[in-house]
């Protein structure tokens, strides 16, 4: 069984924020695979589905981002899901907007939703679908948290459906072929000299403020 988790913050006031692109992606996935209606449990809402012939649970934690692990870990225990069967969809500052990349394992790179899941589960050895939202543009007034807790601009909104479609297709590919094969298909690298920081296999060093255990906690000091 697969447990596919989309990260975000509950409430209408957060629904269109960059930080909620994981929620958006899990909703798009639910539509694509015709999942059952979402029901409340595990401090979140979950739905049953079949993806590429596998039974799956789609989960949206309703704990606010910083406490996502309080929802994910009980769901894993209840459904007897191993870390290798967990897929987390989340926003990624270190990828340009519209870029979707797969990754297995690693740390949280300053993402407080991942931080909570790793803390509660005791391991980071699970799959991630990273949806790029980019870093704040030059001249942005505010902290990184203010940026991810703000809406997409008009150009981004026009491209967002394609980004969500990429995320959905990535999950379908993982379910059908496994992470390694899916990464070979989905993590297409740019031409030499065109590589963006953070692209590829997710192994690039995060920005200084986002390194584990150093600097202020980025994206989600606010809910």
Swiss-Prot record:
Alphabetical keyword list: Cytoplasm, Hydrolase, RNA-binding, tRNA-binding
TM spans (from-to): none
NCBIfam families (UniProt xref): pth (TIGR00447)
Summary of the function given for this chain in its UniProt record: Hydrolyzes ribosome-free peptidyl-tRNAs (with 1 or more amino acids incorporated), which drop off the ribosome during protein synthesis, or as a result of ribosome stalling.
Compartments reported by the entry: Cytoplasm
Site (Stabilizes the basic form of H active site to accept a proton): 91
Active site (record annotation): 19 (proton acceptor)
Lineage of source species: Bacteria, Pseudomonadati, Myxococcota, Polyangia, Polyangiales
Entry's family note: Belongs to the PTH family.
Species name: Sorangium cellulosum (strain So ce56) (Polyangium cellulosum (strain So ce56))
Main localisation: cytoplasm
Protein name: Peptidyl-tRNA hydrolase
Gene (UniProt): pth
Chain residues that bind tRNA: 14, 64, 66, 112
Pfam families, A to Z: Pept_tRNA_hydro
GO BP of this protein: protein quality control for misfolded or incompletely synthesized proteins; rescue of stalled ribosome
Discriminates between blocked and unblocked aminoacyl-tRNA, annotated site positions: 9
GO MF annotation terms: peptidyl-tRNA hydrolase activity; tRNA binding
Domain of life of the source: Bacteria
Enzyme Commission number(s) of this protein: 3.1.1.29
Catalytic activity: an N-acyl-L-alpha-aminoacyl-tRNA + H2O = an N-acyl-L-amino acid + a tRNA + H(+)
CDD domains for the chain: PTH (cd00462)
Region (Disordered): 183-223
Complex formation: Monomer.
């Amino acid at each position: 069984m697969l447990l596919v988790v989309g990260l975000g913050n509950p409430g209408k006031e957060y629904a269109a924020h960059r930080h909620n692109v994981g929620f958006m992606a899990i909703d798009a996935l639910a539509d694509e695979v015709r999942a059952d209606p979402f029901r409340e449990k595990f401090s979140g809402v979950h739905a049953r589905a079949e993806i590429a012939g596998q039974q799956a649970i789609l989960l949206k934690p309703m704990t606010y981002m910083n406490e996502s692990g309080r929802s994910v870990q009980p769901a894993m225990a209840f459904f007897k899901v191993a870390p290798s069967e967990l897929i987390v969809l989340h926003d990624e500052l270190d990828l340009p907007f519209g870029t979707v990349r797969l990754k297995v394992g690693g740390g949280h790179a300053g993402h407080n939703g991942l931080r909570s899941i790793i803390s509660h589960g005791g391991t980071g050895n699970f799959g991630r679908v990273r949806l790029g939202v980019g870093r704040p543009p030059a001249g942005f007034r505010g902290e990184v948290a203010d940026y991810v807790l703000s809406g997409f601009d008009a150009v981004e909104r026009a491209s967002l459906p394609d980004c969500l479609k990429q995320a959905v297709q990535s999950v379908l590919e993982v379910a059908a072929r496994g992470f390694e094969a899916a990464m070979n298909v989905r993590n297409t690298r740019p031409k030499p000299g065109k590589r963006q920081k953070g692209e590829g296999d997710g192994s690039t060093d995060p920005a200084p403020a986002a390194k584990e255990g150093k600097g202020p906690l980025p994206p989600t000091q606010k809910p």
